[in-house]
Amino acid sequence: MNLSAQLHETAANFTSKPAFIFMDRETSYTEFNHAVTQFADGLQSLGIKQGDNVALLLGNSPHFIIGLYSLFRIGATAIPVNPTYTPDEISYILKNGDVKAVIALDLLIPLFEKIDRILPSIEHYIICPSEVSERPVPEDLSISSKMKSFTSVILGGSGSLIEAETAEEDTAIILYTSGTTGKPKGAMLSYRNLYCNARDVADYLGINEHDRVITVLPMFHVFCLTVSLNAPLMNGGTLVIIPKFSPKEVFHVARKYDITLFAGVPTMFNYLLQYPEGKAEDFQSLRFCISGGSAMPIALLKNFEEKFNVIVSEGYGLSEAAPVTCFNPIDRPRKPGSIGKSIIHVENKVVNELGEEVPPGEVGELIVKGPNVMKGYYKLPEETAATIKDGWLYTGDLARMDDEGYFYIVDRKKDMVIVGGFNVYPREVEEVLFAHPDIAEVAVIGAPDPNLGEVIRCFVVSKQASLTEEELIDYCIERLAKYKVPKSIDFMEELPKNTTGKILRRALRNTVLQQS
């Protein structure tokens, strides 16, 4: 169940077919598999062995894919890290993750000089170019003796790679959560977790060797890893790698390469919808699009499908589940606002505070079971025990299921707002506001109130400078119960987002707390 072993088979079946395209350069499956073997051999020659933890601080590039699959091939554990994290965030993950080696962008060399003083246990820094051409590794730095270029590692192998014999429950990857409730936690995913979720996603969506997939979601994010990387690669598909999201580039690539599948977060779909030069003809080869990462407003989904004449299948997942648990069917009725039904081999159910399943239509916590559920959190047995009970992963998301087995995310459990004893789910208010023709983006949070405990506070990005707070509040009064109507509405140039484009409610909450 090691994806790197699967690559041998895929490369044998699709020898000259492009595995990925980057900067208009095609790399065949044979070339990809050979590069993985060479780099894995080079890593082994450096003393990196099965069970060692190795961090990847890279953007979307062939270096990431080759590095990841090389680590799988020698049985080392990969720790993908967002390279745009702050120095403190990166340092924490490298220390907590017991990292032995780092594969990273050359832009981070100054940071590693500082980190090496507090983490001398890191033995190797393998440097990848941030530009198209590779520059020589500096020789006058305090960590120069630990640094090697990506190319030199590929060329420095012994020529006699010993591939690891991994067990299906061995840890393949550690994904650090975004740390919305404190320090990031490392979700340990096994080879079985990764393989099964990629296989089941590919089966559910019908991904095959004829698919050409835009890979623009960050590769260090689990959504991209499974849907836009592992699933296509294990089935002979072709990745078209875009280093950084831009509507112009997505439309260009979709048209040039007859893209059949695009996966993104709702913010990306919103930008594509608003891009004035985007045309339905650009997406004419798309079989469908996939939305995940956060809830997609129903109005956005309908407007996108109508403008571009393409199906958008909304799904659901989380790092701890490798990540996918649900998708809206491609070949059967889809329900706007729903995350769809359980994918094959995965169970989802909604339970109350006692862990008892609730009837259809009733709101409770969504829990998940299947071969995709993580082993646990790295070095955190108590948090693991609180999250996984009797094999069920407690997601922290509030949901309901209808009579036909379709699930609906109501909101994050921690995001629910209690106004005078009444429960208000931010997404419900956001859906109402997003349907307003002059609203581009919206986020809703709870703000402290001395009388009601909490009140609803909204943050919006407007398409029209003339739009007023009073107008929007009146709009909400007509469509929402009184206790759900926003107490105030703030207009912003842009809402805070993480690197995948997900709106950060916690940043807005921090702003409110600082103001109070």
Which residues make up each language-model segment?
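Conserved AMP-binding/adenylation subdomain of ANL enzymes
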Residues: 195-212, 220-261, 271, 275-276
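AMP-dependent adenylate-forming
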Residues: 5-28
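ANL superfamily AMP-binding
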Residues: 16-17, 31-55, 86-87, 91, ...
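AMP-binding/adenylate-forming catalytic core of the ANL superfamily
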Residues: 85, 262, 354, 370, ...
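Structural core segment of the AMP-binding/adenylate-forming
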Residues: 8, 25, 45-46, 66, ...
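Conserved AMP-binding A3 loop
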Residues: 28-30, 172-196
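Conserved pre-ATP/AMP-binding loop-to-beta segment of ANL
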Residues: 16, 126, 145-149, 154-176, ...
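Gly/Ser/Thr-rich phosphate-binding loop
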Residues: 259-264, 273-334, 347
